[in-house]
């Protein structure tokens, strides 16, 4: 039906009132392209939208069951997440957290240009990944070619990114992620030692900068074995950087404890040399044996009773007496230098 009325302006206004019968007879508007009713029954005829329960009661298409968007409800209390299957895509596959922890425990980061150059020349197979800043890459051309040929990942990054990757601002423009070395036993060491062999044994010394300085002195004076409680102490980034390449010329030796280690060396014909500011003989007036184990970190009096032997050689480094003594790293250089002078020079 329709009605019309005249407004004050004289214009005719027409109002259309749609009947319930016409609810399904909406016509298509040829001008706008819109219009046209939805197929189905009108609400007047009892038509209504299907309720949610009705939808759930309808059988689902089989394609829905195979859909990747389908959600699966987990029973209450079943909180164990399913292992994600990413089709073997690298970097996406499930990684066992225990495997990841073990892998990280076996790796360490080495930085410093001299340290990384020496490590590449000595054991390139230990390198897992590398980071460089652009300015050092010309000096690492050989390493870059080797890593590319052996599918080792490397990244050329800026200073901020390298600081983050190495964990220090003292990275020297390069950082390697490497596999740690394992220590050798005393028995393995003495079986291949020569007639002249000096071994450095450290008791309760873990400062990485001291360790780095001592490894540098060892490399300079031909001392190849260093006894430590944990071989990883010689693999820390700070120690290797401080050694300036010297870490690649020494091998960690490990044992149950200092008592057993020294006993094993004594039985193999080595003389144990300790320091003692009270009972020691002046170093530069003492003959040092060709095969010896130099114990540092504790003076003779500070070692466990079971580790001391009356036949051990005790020495001291004479000086002015203006200070209590030398830093352990400096003392190592003096002692090893005298052994080199007497036995190698």
From Swiss-Prot:
Segments of skewed composition (Basic and acidic residues): 18-27, 42-68, 76-86
Short name of any one Pfam family annotated for the protein: SpoU_sub_bind
Enzyme Commission designation: 2.1.1.-
Keyword Methyltransferase: yes
Domain of life of the native organism: Bacteria
Keyword hit for Acetylation: no
Biological processes, Gene Ontology terms: methylation; RNA processing
Alphabetic keyword roster: Methyltransferase, Transferase
GO MF annotations in UniProt: RNA binding; RNA methyltransferase activity
Stretch forming the signal peptide: none
GO cellular component, one term: cytosol
Region (Disordered): 1-98
Top-level class of the enzyme under EC nomenclature: transferase
Family: Belongs to the class IV-like SAM-binding methyltransferase superfamily. RNA methyltransferase TrmH family.
Protein name listed in UniProt: Uncharacterized tRNA/rRNA methyltransferase YfiF
């Amino acid at each position: 039906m329709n009605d019309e009325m005249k407004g004050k302006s004289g214009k005719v206004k027409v109002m259309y009132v749609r009947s319930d019968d016409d609810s399904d007879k909406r016509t298509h508007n040829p001008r706008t392209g819109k219009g046209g009713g939805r197929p189905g029954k009108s609400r007047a005829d009892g038509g209504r939208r299907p309720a949610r329960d009705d939808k759930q009661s309808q059988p689902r298409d089989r394609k829905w069951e195979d859909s990747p968007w389908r959600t699966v409800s987990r029973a209450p209390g079943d909180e164990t997440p399913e292992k994600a299957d990413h089709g073997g895509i690298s970097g996406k596959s499930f990684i066992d957290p225990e495997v990841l922890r073990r892998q990280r425990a076996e790796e360490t980061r080495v930085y410093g240009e001299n340290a990384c150059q020496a490590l590449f020349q000595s054991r390139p197979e230990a390198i897992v990944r590398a980071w460089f800043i652009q300015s050092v890459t010309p000096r690492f051309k050989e390493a870059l070619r080797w890593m590319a040929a052996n599918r080792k990942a490397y990244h050329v990054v800026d200073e901020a990114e390298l600081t983050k990757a190495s964990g220090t601002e003292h990275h020297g423009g390069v950082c390697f992620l490497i596999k740690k070395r394992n220590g050798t036993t005393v028995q393995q060491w003495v079986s291949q030692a020569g007639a002249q062999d000096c071994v450095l044994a450290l008791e309760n010394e873990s400062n990485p900068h001291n360790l780095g300085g001592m490894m540098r002195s060892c490399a300079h004076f031909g001392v190849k074995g260093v006894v430590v409680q944990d071989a990883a102490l010689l693999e820390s980034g700070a120690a290797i950087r401080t050694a300036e390449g010297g870490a690649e010329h020494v091998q960690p030796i490990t044992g149950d404890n200092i008592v057993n280690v020294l006993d094993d060396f004594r039985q193999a014909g080595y003389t144990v040399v300790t320091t003692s500011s009270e009972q020691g003989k002046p170093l530069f007036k003492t003959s040092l044996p060709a095969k010896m184990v130099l114990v540092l970190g504790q003076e003779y009096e500070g070692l466990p009773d079971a580790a001391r032997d009356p036949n051990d050689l005790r020495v001291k480094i004479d000086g002015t007496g203006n200070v209590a003594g030398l830093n352990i790293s400096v003392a190592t250089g003096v002692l090893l230098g005298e052994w080199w002078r007497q036995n190698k020079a």
